[in-house]
Swiss-Prot record:
Gene Ontology biological process terms in this record: CTP biosynthetic process; GTP biosynthetic process; UTP biosynthetic process
Entry's EC annotation: 2.7.4.6
Presence of keyword Cytoplasm: yes
Sites where the protein binds ATP: 11, 59, 87, 93, 104, 114
Family from the record: Belongs to the NDK family.
UniProt gene name: ndk
GO terms of molecular function: ATP binding; metal ion binding; nucleoside diphosphate kinase activity
Source organism: Shewanella baltica (strain OS155 / ATCC BAA-1091)
Protein name: Nucleoside diphosphate kinase
């Protein structure tokens, strides 16, 4: 098993409903360690840059508007197969299709406001982590 790092966002809808602690508990209960975190209110430019790969898609404007509608939590998680483990904890992108007990099933209202984001691969995780965190901000958990 490989120790990996993945990137996670708790989106504005879940932050507004005070689900941060409950979601962090899910990460830690699943064996993922939080090695960096911070609260941000994305600017339009930051959101457009982060989601640039979707810029030609019809939902891009709504996504940027949603992601700038309130504070978010960004965090780096570390653990065995962290990318897959995190995505399993999140559940399906559409909360209506997410398995009971997953973050999206429990905390999300719709596919547009689905509580959280998780990297889909180790490579995208590295890119997404670097977008929000410097190397100095990552704190290895040695104990």
């Amino acid at each position: 098993m490989a120790i990996e790092r993945t990137f996670s966002i708790i989106k504005p809808d879940a932050v507004a409903k005070n689900h941060i602690g409950a979601i962090y508990n899910r990460f830690e209960t699943a064996g993922l360690k939080i090695v960096a975190s911070k609260m941000l209110h994305l600017t339009k430019e930051q959101a457009e840059g982060f989601y640039a790969e979707h810029s030609e898609r019809g939902f891009f404007g709504a996504l940027v508007a949603f992601m700038t509608s309130g504070p978010i939590m960004v965090q780096v998680l570390e653990g065995e197969n962290a990318v897959l483990a995190h995505r399993e904890i999140l559940g399906a992108t559409n909360p209506a299709q997410a398995a009971p007990g997953t973050i999206r099933a429990d905390f999300a209202e719709s596919i547009d406001e689905n509580a959280a984001h998780g990297s889909d691969a180790v490579e995208s995780a590295a890119r997404e982590i670097a977008y929000f965190f410097s190397a100095e901000e990552l704190c290895p958990r040695t104990r």
